Amino acid sequence: MKTLAVVDSSGWLEYFTGSSRAQFFAQAIEETENLVVPIITIYEVFKKVHRERGESAALQVASSMQGGTVVDLDLSIALDAARLQLPLADSIIYTTAPRHGAVLWTQDDHFKGLPSVRYFPIPSTSP
């Protein structure tokens, strides 16, 4: 049995823009039978794509994200997420992953060192 995956919003954005970092998230995103998608992730990605590329592109992205199992925010996740010292969306995304037996794939420093996280650090760009 494969491990389930939750991909953080930044990973989805790397994937959809085809950046050089998309490779880190492609496997988790493309194996939709093992993909858990917190609804707040769709919100964050839709909002950014809508702002930068318009309604049509944002709707296509949101549709694509629904290939995995979309998970709504419930009271239990909300309360557990509120106990974390993370920003709102990050705490909900992080709490959703273990709740569904998934590993969180991310490049966000907020999650570095936390259990059940597959962290892909962004190389520093020193002058």
Regions found by a protein language model. Name each.
Residues 10, 76, 91-95:
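Active-site phosphate/pyrophosphate-handling residues
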